[in-house]
Swiss-Prot record:
Gene clusters encoding host-selective toxins (HSTs) are localized on conditionally dispensable chromosomes (CDCs), also called supernumerary chromosomes, where they are present in multiple copies. The CDCs are not essential for saprophytic growth but controls host-selective pathogenicity. It comes from the Eukaryota. The active site is at residue 200. Substrate binds at residues 115, 204, 208, 270. Pathway: Mycotoxin biosynthesis. This is Oxidoreductase AFT12-1. Keywords: NADP, Oxidoreductase, Virulence. It comes from Alternaria alternata (Alternaria rot fungus). InterPro entries: 6-PGluconate_DH-like_C_sf (IPR008927), 6PGD_dom2 (IPR013328), KPA_reductase (IPR013752), KPR-Related (IPR051402), KPR_N (IPR013332). Its EC number is 1.-.-.-. It holds the Pfam family ApbA.
Length: 297
């Protein structure tokens, strides 16, 4: 199996912290060959690999089978899976599609491993003849220096939840999903990815917003009376919106999300990381969809 930053032959697009961990877990069992596409961290990863310090798996040095700086370097490779783990920012969408188009073949499966509701939809539109999977990550991780990945906590039993989004053949998509998640116990196949995406959306809207607004990690937010009040208000509003849109979100989801963070080590959310580093925020992915749904209602 070959993966563009995944396992079989897999290609992973833009090696973020999430993408680096996903690539590592997909390759480590030895059943796949992984190519990673790196940008600013290319020299470090090409020379020394990824240096990972994780609360789940300990410390490791992970060297992908191949490290590329430009997708044109691997455009003649037949990839079984292509994984996009880039930030879900609208300014990069067109570039992402145009790059991935160079390595997608009729049998290639595309996995969108990004934040937001249905971020994979642009792939289903661009590649209607291919199987498209949607993935959700429940890890707190960051790239603290080029190629150096720190994973501090997780709020779910599995790191990655993956489900089917679209495919010309349901049977084929189911087989490709099973094949992918079989590579590592960190991956879990889920039946209804939409519900899981909405639960992650509640989590992101609540804690990314609160931590960025208060410039504090999750524990400091939850230890504050005003912080816990804000968190619960955001979570309940997002939960109620999901129900109004017909999402079968389980009862107790809001309490469960808050309890998960109360029992986890402090989390510096991705939005807070980006804010402190002066990087663009994933506002469209995390908050823009809610505005759209509110207009619909």
């Amino acid at each position: 199996m070959v993966v563009h930053s995944l396992g079989s032959t897999n290609l992973q697009e833009n090696q973020s912290a999430v993408g680096a961990i996903a690539a590592w877990r997909l390759q480590h069992a030895g059943y796949s060959r992984v190519t990673t596409l790196c940008r600013s961290n290319y020299d470090a990863v090409k020379t020394s690999g990824f240096r990972l310090s994780t609360s789940l798996w300990g410390k490791h040095i992970y060297k992908p089978d191949r490290v590329a700086n430009d997708i044109r370097e691997v455009k003649h490779t037949e990839f079984d899976y292509v994984v996009d783990a880039t930030k879900n920012i609208s300014a990069t969408w067109t570039l992402s599609i145009s790059e991935i188009r160079q390595v997608v073949r009729p049998r290639t499966t595309i996995l969108s491993l990004q934040n937001g509701m249905q971020p994979e939809r642009r792939f289903t539109k661009a590649f209607p003849a291919n199987t498209v999977l949607a993935g959700i990550c429940f890890l707190s991780c960051s790239q603290i220096s080029p190629g150096c990945i720190l994973q501090t906590s997780h709020i779910r039993p599995h790191a990655f939840y993956i489900g089917m989004s679209s495919s010309p053949s349901f049977r084929d998509a189911k087989q490709k999903l099973r094949r992918l998640v079989s590579l590592d116990s960190s991956f879990l196949a889920v039946r209804d990815i939409r519900i899981q995406q909405w639960i992650k959306l509640i989590t992101n809207v609540t804690f990314n917003s609160a931590t960025a607004l208060m410039n504090a990690h999750t524990r400091d937010v939850l230890d504050s009376a005003s912080g816990i009040e804000l968190v619960r208000a955001l979570a309940e509003e997002c939960y109620e919106l999901g129900l109004a849109l017909g999402m079968a979100i389980p009862q107790g989801t809001v309490d469960s999300i808050i309890e998960d963070f109360l029992s986890a080590p402090p989390v510096v959310t991705s939005m807070l990381q980006d804010l402190r580093a002066g990087r663009p925020l994933e506002l469209d992915a995390l908050l823009g969809k809610l505005k759209t749904y509110l207009v619909i209602l």
